[in-house]
């Protein structure tokens, strides 16, 4: 009996990995999986629809799972850079954090946009699962350095400037580069 349970768990882990790997491959090829039906995703992955739903109750959860490794890698890179550069001014540290986040956002724009918009009726960066982790990392940079009134409110406001809709507008309509966008934003909060 125990051997059967392990085999079932092994099969389940295998199926989950197949689904994630297939979707990651599609994303790398430029496919927008947010437009695909769950039945199509199951078919493309070579699993049954029931198997797909056992692992991921919704397309949003599937997209979040796809992003989990990428998000963790982003935070590892940020923490490594910050650890190596403890003497940097707060602005430089925050610039690195937000640059790394924008790198992730630009590389996975449609997926993060889908997560933002499907998490609630409002389109907000607050809806991304790692929002609090990102905000807490920013808060840490201010500890013992700057006293900013209403820091929590200001960071919520600042991070909402990273919503997919607004960032797309800034990049494509106002023609700002990533660094120009960050400089203008940081000037508002850190001058």
From Swiss-Prot:
Residues 12-74 form the HTH tetR-type domain. The keyword DNA-binding applies. Residues 37-56 bind DNA. The keyword Transcription regulation applies. InterPro entries: Homeodomain-like_sf, HTH-type_Tx_Regulator, HTH_TetR. Transmembrane segments: none annotated. It comes from the Bacteria. One of its GO terms (molecular function) is DNA binding. Coiled coil: none annotated. PROSITE patterns: HTH_TETR_2. Keywords: DNA-binding, Transcription, Transcription regulation. Pfam families: TetR_N. This is HTH-type transcriptional regulator SAR0097. The lineage of its organism: Bacteria, Bacillati, Bacillota, Bacilli, Bacillales.
